[in-house]
Every structure is written in C-alpha cells, then in structure tokens.
Amino acid sequence: MTDKNPEYDFLWCPGCGDFGVRRALEFAMEELNITHERTMEENVVVAGIGCSGNTVHLLEGEQPYGFHGIHGRSLPVAMGTKMSRPDLNVVVVAGDGDFLSIGMEHIAPQAARNLNITAIIMDNGVYGLTKGQSSPTTTIETVTNSTPFGKMEVAVNPLDLYLTLGVTFIASGYSVKPRDLAKLMVRGMEHPGFSIVHVASPCTTYNDNFTQLKGSAKLGIQPTAWAIPEDHDAGSKTAARGIIDEGGVPLGVVYEDTSRPSFDAQFDAVRTKNPQKSPADLLAVFDL
C-alpha cells in the first residue's frame, strides 16, 4: 500500500504529542525495514479507540497495513494477527485510557505468553478524544470534565504494572524527541517477546503538561522527565524497580529479560513436533 485513506480527514490538535510518536514510529519501521530487508507492507499497526488510534490513518509515505479495532481490544487483535502471520512485524498503538482501562485485562495474559509483539502507549493522562475526562493515569485530585471536584482514585503507575505482570521489555520515552523515541521502539521491536514502549505524550487541549515534563528555568519548574543513567542494569528487576520508584518520567530502557522464550518460538516448536495435516490427509484415513 502506498496511499493513506483519502476519505479520512481526522487531524490531531496543533502541538499534540502524538505527532512526535507517529514520526518516531515511521523512523523505527523505516530503519528495521532496511535492517531486515522487508517491505513496509510486512508491518501491521493495530490500534484501539482514541486519539492514538488515528495513527493507523496518519502515517506518511509508504503505508503499513493498519487495523483500527475496538476500544481496549488491540492486544487480542494483535495476537490473532501475529499467530496467523508470524512473519509480520506487529505493532500496537494505544492510549492510556484505551490500554490501561478497559484494555488492562489483556496485558497480563500477553505478559504470561510473551508473544513477540510491540505495544506503543501514548499517555496523555486524560481521555482526549471524548473531550477531557480523567483516565487511569490522571493524578488524584485533578479536576477534569468528569471529575469536577477532583479525581478520587489513585493513578495507575504503568511502568510498575508492566514490571509486576512480567512484561519482558519495558521502555519509557517522551514524544518531543522522535529520534530518541524511535531508538526505543527499534529496541522493543527487536526484542524476542512482548515489549511495551510507554510514551509521555502531552495533550495540548485538555492536559498540557509539556512544561512540567520539560521543565522551565524561567518559571522555576524542575523537569519530571529524566534520562536513565547509562550504567543502569536493565536486566535486573531490582534495578528496574529502583528506576520506577524514582518517579517522574524516566527516559530509556527500564527492563529487558531475554531469558524467556517467546510464545511464537514455543508454538513453532509444537508445530514441528506435531505437524498439521491437510483436509485431504485427514480424509485419506477413511475408506471413502
């Protein structure tokens, strides 16, 4: 495919962090296409509902295949795609509301399976497409359109959740630096198992936390985004927990476990031991 849907006219708001995520995804797929000598059509982008879901329609240049599914169900769709076509690079794009609310129930099973897919989560701390309601990552006491007296629930800590559930690759990034973010996406896509790249992606309309993430010397605001030290041992769960407990938005690879086999590899081993028979082979055992 070489063309975007000509009838699709959705645009993100000016300054939306998702533009940076989209560009990073383009950089990552282009690099891996060269490295692995594959075409753009050998990539599939699966999305749920929300502003993040429109990534499948807004990518520039040569187009990967895209599946714009239903709310919270991007991981099951991605699993079906990967199991039927294990040769494809399958990428999930989802928002914090989509992935960590109705879609949260699917994270644990995928972590247990360790299927070789990559999920890119665009976290703006709010439901943007439906006009500014609180999401699972909205901080407590925050006033939104759905919490006029302040949110009463404690916010989900996504990185802590992923580590606890056993996701084998966890990275954290920031949408304002697409080139750096693309490097994390490449690492995730090359990881042999379930990988999640969680991205702070500010919503300029309903939750503009750009200044807090970046910091401002003029306003005396310390940045909440910070670079993970180069000597961080990403293979250590204890070290990963320490990074997460520091708070804020760490930038880099938080955790990677390459000791577990992927679900794909295990499934291929089973198929080798028990090869599938065609309908003709099955019918041949009967005297018809």
Predicted regions and their residues:
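Thiamine diphosphate
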Residues: 49-128
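Short, surface-exposed, charged loop/turn segments at secondary-structure junctions
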Residues: 133-140, 178, 185-194, 207-222, ...
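Glycine-rich beta-alpha junction loops
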Residues: 49-51, 124-126, 200-206, 257-260
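Short coil/turn connectors at secondary-structure junctions
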Residues: 8, 39-43, 62-65, 84-90, ...
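Conserved thiamine diphosphate
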Residues: 3, 87, 135-188
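Active-site diphosphate/adenylate-binding microenvironment
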Residues: 2-70
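Short catalytic-loop micro-motif centered on adjacent basic/acidic residues
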Residues: 12-14, 92-94, 169-174, 196
